[in-house]
């Protein structure tokens, strides 16, 4: 998971409580690049 996206974009879940790091990372990538 990219810390840059985590720091730049708001996360729906606190770090460590994410249901799936892969899903959250995909969402951040979509929002950041889209």
UniProtKB/Swiss-Prot annotation:
There is a cross-link at residues 11-19 (Cyclopeptide (His-Pro)). Processed by the macrocyclase-peptidase enzyme POPB to yield a toxic cyclic nonapeptide. POPB first removes 10 residues from the N-terminus. Conformational trapping of the remaining peptide forces the enzyme to release this intermediate rather than proceed to macrocyclization. The enzyme rebinds the remaining peptide in a different conformation and catalyzes macrocyclization of the N-terminal 9 residues. Keywords: Toxin. Residues 1-10, 20-34 form a propeptide. GO terms for molecular function: toxin activity. InterPro entries: Amanitin/phalloidin (IPR027582). It comes from the Eukaryota. Probable toxin that belongs to the MSDIN-like toxin family responsible for a large number of food poisoning cases and deaths. Belongs to the MSDIN fungal toxin family. This is MSDIN-like toxin proprotein 12.
């Amino acid at each position: 998971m990219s810390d840059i996206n985590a720091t730049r974009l708001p996360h729906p879940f606190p770090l460590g409580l994410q249901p799936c790091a892969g899903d959250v990372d995909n969402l951040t990538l979509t929002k950041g690049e889209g």
